Amino acid sequence: MQAIWLNNYPAGVSKTLDLDPAETLLDFFESSTTAWSDRPAFHNLGHTLSYADIDHLSQQFAAYLQDSLGLERGDRVAIMMPNLLQYPVALFGCLRAGMVVVNVNPLYTARELEHQLVDSGAKALIVYAGSAHVYAEIKHATAIEHVLVTEPGDLLPLVKRLLVNFVVRYVRKMIPKYAIGSAVPFRAILKARMSAYRRPEKLTGKDLAILQYTGGTTGLAKGAMLSNSNLLANVTQVNGWFGGRDVPGKEIIITALPLYHVYALTVNCLSYFEKGALNILITDPRDTKGLIKEMSRWPFTALTGVNTLFQSLVRHPDFAALDFSTLKVVSAGGMALQADTAREWQRVTGTQVIEGYGLSETSPVVSSNPLDLPEYNGSIGMPFPETNVSIRDENGVEVALGVAGELCVSGPQVMLGYWNKPEATAEVMTADGFFETGDLATMDEKGYLRIVGRKKDMIIVGGFNVYPDEVENVVTEHPDVLEAACIGVPDDDGDDDEVVKLFVVVREGSAVTPEQLRAWCKENMAAYKVPKKVEFRTELPKSNVGKVLRRELRDEQVAG
């Protein structure tokens, strides 16, 4: 498409970027730790590691992988832990050794973990003790040769370390029993000889850095191959877009999203690392009271999150008492931002949530609204610099402005392909080099994009296309509604047509009826889009980052 968005970029955002294809994440890390050596880098559980600490510990970790474990450049190393100080140490240690990081969700079941470890061919696993029992169930089915087990307090000072680990294991009983005979404590890395570290030679930007597995919404998760250049390009894009308000070396970002999720990995861990920022790592963001208490200790300047995180914060009675005077950047992604959430956030904090869009396959950020957005607009913003988009119909033909079609993306942040899946890669890459996202979108005359639904979630009612996102956005505007999701189900009249079924979570004390919700919909959308069936729920199925899982609702309907 013609890049009409370039003419509407906010002041200070360059239309082009100076990207060095030879630069690696190792170069990036070394320059950042040198520049910000004495600055605090990561804080968790009451303890802070400086950039110099991260430099030292990650080199020890790299040396341990190379010397003690005998791993080689290109070997895959899986990291399975929540936000702890050990995560950046392990991440950067692997990258400094020239190895490939496989990010693993610590909430995975044995089946999910087995698939990811087998598919990636990982040789080593660094696992949080609370998840070790899951690995123990499937250890003989994988190619894992080395296991390092970490407990929450492993990088804390002695007294605090012993106390935290004791409380987690014996008081809160958060560490189920497990049997992994060859497991090594994470703190073994502290005995590694620094002199044993060997900086990998001839690393290039094209080299694979991370296997970021997709959410598996359409079957088994696939490993998106993200190169050094992919990730560094996105870091440059993110900092070029949001950097105008930043003061290098002075920023404090609240990292409530898990670092194993590509959104937090690129934006919080990498982009803010380059700026010398302090990352406040939140181990359990579902503990809203604890999250707010931690936020109260810091003059935080930035926060990333998803809709459900922002909802839980603004609805908590303690949140409004926080000091928001230093808050400059609030970025949302991972799922659609609801209008009522955005407006309530602005009312309480005086800041605007800036919604963006991305995928695992794009490192992840593709687009964002400008920082000076005056109010919520329902858009995912404009494509980033050096990013091209094309909205195409089912025949691959580009559609006109305002017409819905599949969002296709090209740019330096687009993955190399899916790990060991050339056929799956070919299915999503077009002949002219675009990645087919599977999301349906429109573009307006200024270049702003709007997601109207997933291609596979689209509901066809009487020959008309109904996009779940649109219906859900209308329903969540109702004052009695907290959350909503809709899917297509067979009509009861026995023909092959679909109808819209709505699942709703209402506010406490609400007496709203299905008929009232349908009447609300009739006032705000065409008749064929109005849900024919309405079901009230106490909660909706969600992913670990709070994204509503429509596929589980569909599976329930099929199962009867």
Regions found by a protein language model. Name each.
Residues 382-386, 397-428, 466:
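Conserved ATP/PPi-binding loop(s) of AMP-dependent carboxylate-activating enzymes
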Residues 38-72, 78-84, 88-92, 109-114:
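Conserved AMP-binding/adenylate-forming core of the ANL superfamily
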Residues 68-72, 193-206, 211-255, 277:
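Conserved adenylate-forming
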Residues 3-7, 27-50:
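AMP-dependent adenylate-forming
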Residues 7, 136-205:
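ANL superfamily adenylate-forming
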Residues 232-252, 262-302, 316:
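Conserved AMP-binding/adenylation subdomain of ANL enzymes
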Residues 108, 115, 411, 416-417, ...:
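AMP-binding/adenylate-forming catalytic core of the ANL superfamily
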Residues 166, 277, 300-304, 314-375, ...:
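Gly/Ser/Thr-rich phosphate-binding loop
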